[in-house]
Amino acid sequence: MSNKNTFEGTTTVGITCKDGVVFASERRASMGNLVAHKVAEKIFKIDNHIAATIAGSVADAQTLMKVISAETSLYRLRNGKDISLEAAAAVSSNILHSSPAYVQTLIGGVDDTGASIYSLDAAGGMIKDTFISTGSGSTFAYGVLEDRFYEDITVEEATEVAIRAIKAATERDTFSGNGFLVANVTKDGFKMLEKEEVDAIIEKINS
């Protein structure tokens, strides 16, 4: 398979919290040994209560995000209510199962049943978990997640854990780096953290 327009080195993290979910990623997009892009967007708002992360083919990933977002909007129009996280993940799984793509995604958020995160592979395989990491630096990220995750963790606390996990990946994985993206979804909706907010947390971690 050609690696043209492909993220080969992504590291992403998703954490389920008692009051929402947290997503984090680094920003490097690599093609083989080339750092092709230093400010790649890897976290997407799907709806007010749903977000997703991507790794894989740029074209496939962007198309998938647009289709999922359209499906969630269509569901609201047809049913007069927001789609559940399980249903949104199932729709995404069906899309990938019927048309496999070179992409891996995390999808999660908050609905009437609480917070949840699902991992989807290129063929549509779907797994729900409390915390998940994908990509070339996931081994290093999982070390932090396994050590620092605990039941009933809050979004605020998980944000620092997620940044620590991505930081560990960028320090050891040559295909991950060039900054951080962090977002959360709570009952109040989707929020992407500003660079200054992320930098303040990193400074706290380093102190």
UniProtKB/Swiss-Prot annotation:
<keyword id="KW-0068">Autocatalytic cleavage</keyword>
<keyword id="KW-0645">Protease</keyword>
<dbReference type="InterPro" id="IPR001353">
    <property type="entry name" value="Proteasome_sua/b"/>
</dbReference>
<dbReference type="InterPro" id="IPR019983">
    <property type="entry name" value="Pept_T1A_Psome_bsu_arc"/>
</dbReference>
<keyword id="KW-0647">Proteasome</keyword>
<dbReference type="GO" id="GO:0004298">
    <property type="term" value="F:threonine-type endopeptidase activity"/>
</dbReference>
<dbReference type="InterPro" id="IPR029055">
    <property type="entry name" value="Ntn_hydrolases_N"/>
</dbReference>
<dbReference type="InterPro" id="IPR000243">
    <property type="entry name" value="Pept_T1A_subB"/>
</dbReference>
<keyword id="KW-0378">Hydrolase</keyword>
<comment type="function">
    <text>Component of the proteasome core, a large protease complex with broad specificity involved in protein degradation.</text>
</comment>
<comment type="subunit">
    <text>The 20S proteasome core is composed of 14 alpha and 14 beta subunits that assemble into four stacked heptameric rings, resulting in a barrel-shaped structure. The two inner rings, each composed of seven catalytic beta subunits, are sandwiched by two outer rings, each composed of seven alpha subunits. The catalytic chamber with the active sites is on the inside of the barrel. Has a gated structure, the ends of the cylinder being occluded by the N-termini of the alpha-subunits. Is capped at one or both ends by the proteasome regulatory ATPase, PAN.</text>
</comment>
<feature type="active site" description="Nucleophile">
    <location>
        <position position="10"/>
    </location>
</feature>
<comment type="similarity">
    <text>Belongs to the peptidase T1B family.</text>
</comment>
<dbReference type="Pfam" id="PF00227">
    <property type="entry name" value="Proteasome"/>
</dbReference>
<dbReference type="InterPro" id="IPR016050">
    <property type="entry name" value="Proteasome_bsu_CS"/>
</dbReference>
<dbReference type="InterPro" id="IPR023333">
    <property type="entry name" value="Proteasome_suB-type"/>
</dbReference>
<dbReference type="GO" id="GO:0005737">
    <property type="term" value="C:cytoplasm"/>
</dbReference>
<feature type="propeptide" description="Removed in mature form; by autocatalysis">
    <location>
        <begin position="1"/>
        <end position="9"/>
    </location>
</feature>
<keyword id="KW-0963">Cytoplasm</keyword>
<dbReference type="GO" id="GO:0010498">
    <property type="term" value="P:proteasomal protein catabolic process"/>
</dbReference>
<keyword id="KW-0888">Threonine protease</keyword>
<protein>
    <recommendedName>
        <fullName>Proteasome subunit beta</fullName>
        <ecNumber>3.4.25.1</ecNumber>
    </recommendedName>
</protein>
<keyword id="KW-0865">Zymogen</keyword>
<dbReference type="GO" id="GO:0019774">
    <property type="term" value="C:proteasome core complex, beta-subunit complex"/>
</dbReference>
